[in-house]
Every structure is written in structure tokens, then in C-alpha cells.
């Protein structure tokens, strides 16, 4: 019987979709070639539409429910431990390092799951003001966030590029290049983790082909660049982003409370004190 090779697709709006371009690019893992989608401009636009809907659905869940959903993802990873281990070993990691990376990935998810219903208490505050008023800082998620993920062949690194924005209630468009096979495999577990469709979208492709379209898209609220890019690309992104006041973060933190700060904005509420 002939071997049936797995067909990897983008994950957008809770569905597996082929690229509108009809094109793929090749990734080699342990002398075996994988064809993954070459995302087009139309695919990016579709992902933004899905992410906007996903943001609304993700925001409707209570913080406690978000915690449950993220914890469910850690359970899915544990259930597919051997599959991830083999992928990481095919990418060049030793068996011991692959196992360690997956254990760290599970720990990272559990940490962020625990933060999903606590971060607002830890970042908001009551501000001292003159007069008989309460002045309270309230934090909200930014909206649709595009992440350019690191090329590091690491499940933990991949998740840490997505989780900070997702934890505070943003929807995420996760873009991957050399680690696309790992990312698209992760999409299968995300699909089974009860995350609302569109809250997390995973694409593969070549960033340099789409950099202008992504940085110019007015409905992408923020871009988090976790991969090393050229200075001229950074300049282009910042110039294009300025037209829509898009927030740009180059190599932001990936762990700890400070990793959440780029993806939230502060609103203040004034309320008269009772007498």
C-alpha cells in the first residue's frame, strides 16, 4: 500500500483551509520534505475577518472560561506527546531536548491559563486623584494581533509567541515560516481545545512577500515580531503602521506579567464617592 502523506493546511476561523494562492513551499525535516501553504494577501485578509469574529467570541467568555480553554490545550499536548517529540527530533533536537521542550510548553500553557482570570486584578489599580472621586484604571485587550513567530524549532517558543496576546483576550494571527510544520500540527490540537473559531489563526508562508500588506492593514491592531528581521523591514513596518496607529513590538517579552503589557490598553473610570 502506498504511503499517504499528510496535507498541511492553514488554520483560519476554526477551519483548515488551503491557500488562495494554490501554492506551497517546501520544508525539510530529517531528509523528508513537507509542502506547506504559501499564504497570499487574500489569505491575510480572510484571516483578519476571521480574527475579528474570533475576538468577539473570545471576549464573551468569562476569564474563568478562558482559563479552562487554555488548560484544555495543555491536556491535548500531553495526549499527543509522542507526535510532537517525533517532529522535534526530525527537526534536529535530541530525544532528551525534545521531551524537555514539550514539558516546558505544557508548563507555559498552564502558567498562562492561570493568569487568564488574574491579570486584570494585577494590572489595574485605584488611582489617587484630587476631589471626591474614585479613579480606576481598567485594562482591555487591543483586538486583532499579528505575530511573526520565531524560526526556532521549539514547541515552547512557538506557544510563547501566541499565549501572551491570547491570554488577555486578543485574537491572534500566528504567522510561521521555518517552523510551519510544527505550528500547523499544533493547529489540530487548538481545534480540539474549545477555543472559539477565529480566536487563534495559524498561517504558513514567507513574511517578506506580505510585509507591506500586513503592516498596512488597518484592522490589525498590533504586530508582535518575535523573529529577527532586517532593519529596513522594521522601518517599513513602523512607517506603514503609523498610518493606522498600529502598535509595533519588536522582540517583546514572552514570559511573566510584563509579557501581557503590550497587548492591553488602559481606560480610566471616574465615579463620585458617596457621602
Task: Please describe what each predicted stretch is.
Residues 110, 114-193:
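Conserved small-residue-rich beta-alpha loop and adjacent elements
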Residues 30, 66, 169, 200, ...:
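Residue-level signal for inorganic ion chemistry
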Residues 1-131, 164, 177-178, 192, ...:
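N-terminal Rossmann-like NAD(P)+-binding subdomain of aldehyde/semialdehyde dehydrogenases
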Residues 42, 46, 100, 104, ...:
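Conserved active-site and cofactor/substrate-binding residues in soluble primary-metabolism enzymes
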Residues 129, 135, 139-148, 193-275:
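Conserved NAD(P)+-binding/catalytic subdomain of aldehyde/semialdehyde dehydrogenases
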Residues 20, 81, 98, 155-158, ...:
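Alpha-helix N-cap/helix-start motif
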